[in-house]
Amino acid sequence: MFRLRFLPMKTGAGAGASASECKTTDDLTLVAASWRNSDSMPPGSSIVTSPGLAKVLTHAELGSCDAWKHAFRNKCKDHRYYEIIEETLEDAFEYHYLLLEDDSGNARAIQPVFFVRQNLVEGVPGKMSSIVDRVRKIFPHFLTMRVLMVGCAAGTGDLAACDERDETWVANALQASLSSYARQNKASLVVLKDFPATYRLELETFPIHGYARIPSMPMTRLPLPYNNWDEYFLTLSKATRKDLRRKFRKAERPPKIEMEVVSDIAPLVDEIHPLYLAVHERSPLKFETLTKGYFRTIGRRMPDRARFFIWRQLGKIVAFSFCLVCDDKIYDECIGLDYSVALDLHLYFYTLRDIISWALEHGLKYYYSNPLNYEPKLHLDCELVPLDLYVTHTNSLLNPIFRHFLKYLGPTRHDPVLQRFPNADQL
C-alpha cells in the first residue's frame, strides 16, 4: 500500500495581508549555514509563478507574519497545531512554509509543506512485502523516495488561504510552484496528503496538470441527531446491540472504571504515553509518532479545543483518548490502551460509548474518527469521510508510467471492509 495515508483562478476575492507584514529575519546567515549540507532550498528563496510568488519561510519567520494568524483560522487544526507539530514531532520531517503572494504583493496564503523519505510499499501484504524487506537488507532505500508533502504531518490536509474565498487561487498557485520547488530540493514525488474530498473542486487543477488523485484511507463520521446514548443505541442492528451489551457487562464488573475529562494532560503524560505507544505499535500503518512533548504542549496551547478522556481502574489509568472539539464536532485523534486489561474488558468499545455520550451531553452533532479499524465502525453505523492523495512524479517523462503504477499501490485496495460502507462509492 502506498503509505501516504495514508496519508479557474479566482482573483480579487478577499486579498490577504500585505507581504510587507511578513517580515523575514534580518540575518539569515546563521540559518542558511545549517542548510548548506541539506537537500533543501535555504530560507528566503522564492519561486516565480504565473499567479505571483512563492517564498520559502522558516518556523522562526512565522512569528512576524500576520498572514500566518489568518491561515487555518476557521479550521479545527489552526496555525497553533502546525506550530506544535513542528516543535514536538521527532520523525524525520523537514518542515517549511510557502508564503503565496499575488502579483500585487498581497499574502494570500501560507501553506505548510514538509519533506520526508517515504516507503512506497508500506502496508502492502503478502509476498511483495517480504521480497522488498530482503532487498532492503542490501539496499536500504529500495522503493523509497524523497517526497515533498503538502498538508499536515499529523492529520488531514487543508488549504491555508488567509481568506477561504481564495482557496481556488491558492490551489492554482501551489500547482504552479510545487513541482519546481520539489525538483530544486531533490524530491522525486509531490503529494498533497489526505485532503478531504470537499476540496475536490478547488483542487481540480492538480489532475488537470498531471497529478493522479487516489483515495487515501478515509476517516469515519457518526452523525449524532440523538438526545443520549440509549437513543442512538436503539438505532443499531439487533446483532450489534447484543454484542455491545455483552462487552459492556464485562467492563462494568468490579472494580469500577471511572472516567475523567481534562484539557491539560501534562501532569499525566508519563502514564498515558506508553498506552499510546502500545496501540501505535500494533497499527499496520505508521506515519508520525506522537511524542510526550506533543501531548504536553497541545493541551496548554489549545485548551479551547483539546480534550483528554481518561479511564481509571483502581486508580490506574487503563485507557485514554485525545480529542479535539470544534464547533459542533468532536474529532477522536488517538487512543491509548493498557493491553493487560484492554482486550478482556473490551475497552475500545467502552471508551467509545463514553465519548459519544459526552458529546451528546454537550450538544455536539458529529463524531469523527481517524482512519483504520473499520469493522467496528461499520457496525456502529459510521459513514466514510473520503480523503484524497494527489500525487505526481517530478520527472515529466516518468510521470505517466508512475501514474499507471499508482493504482496498484492505492491504500484502500487492501481493506475489503471499506467496500461494505454505504457511501464507499464516494472514495
Spans of features found by a protein language model:
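Short C-terminal domain-edge/linker segments immediately following a structured domain
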Residues: 91, 129-131, 139-147, 221-225, ...
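A conserved beta-strand-loop-helix scaffold within acyl/acetyltransferase catalytic domains
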Residues: 49-130, 179-180, 188-343, 425-427
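Active-site/acyl-donor-binding loops of N-acyltransferases
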Residues: 2-10, 22-51, 115-119, 156, ...
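Hydrophobic alpha-helix feature that most strongly marks membrane-spanning transmembrane helices
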Residues: 277-284, 299-303, 316, 322-323, ...
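Acyl-donor binding region in acyl/amide transferases
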Residues: 94-95, 102, 108, 115-213, ...
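Intrinsically disordered, low-complexity segments enriched in serine/proline and basic residues
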Residues: 14-18
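Acidic/proline-rich low-complexity IDRs
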Residues: 3-6, 27-29, 56, 137, ...
